[in-house]
Amino acid sequence: MVAKKDKYVFAQVIRDVIEFLEIEDDPTPELTPEALAERYTEILQIAVRLVQQFPDVSLDNELPNRPRSWKVLLHHVFQIPKAFLDNEEKSQEYTYELMTESPPEKLKNSSDISNFGEEISNRFILWWKKSRDSDFSKQVPTYFGMTSRHELLERTVWHSTQHIRQLQSLLENLEIKP
């Protein structure tokens, strides 16, 4: 949240913050959808590889200062693109609940989660092949308001990427080279 006196704006969308603070800036994503898709394909493959490295005994560990297990975080890395793809392919609203959905019972260990990640990665690649020439300026509904498909793709990429850094750090804390 960003506040000025008795007014505030939720800082979910950079465009809202820029307008609220009356800053002259263009919040349009700098990378094209094609560049974002290329990077995301790599990022998802890195995530799959990192998840495979987690010992199953560590999955119930809690993140520092956060009531979230490592298992939930590992799943979340792939639930983010799943929510994006559901929005794109099924016209399902991009909700906070969908993005933060808990891992299903069938995902019991690191191998199960990495297999789920591989499925999502392959689904993303197929989606991109079909969508690359579509209109990314089209507005879509999300839990933080209407946003362009381009902005939602960018947000999806950076969100997963931020969690990749967490995975690397957790592996390093276990003295496992990422």
Model segments located where?
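Acidic/histidine-rich alpha-helical segments that form the ligand environment
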Residues: 36-53, 104-137, 151-156, 161
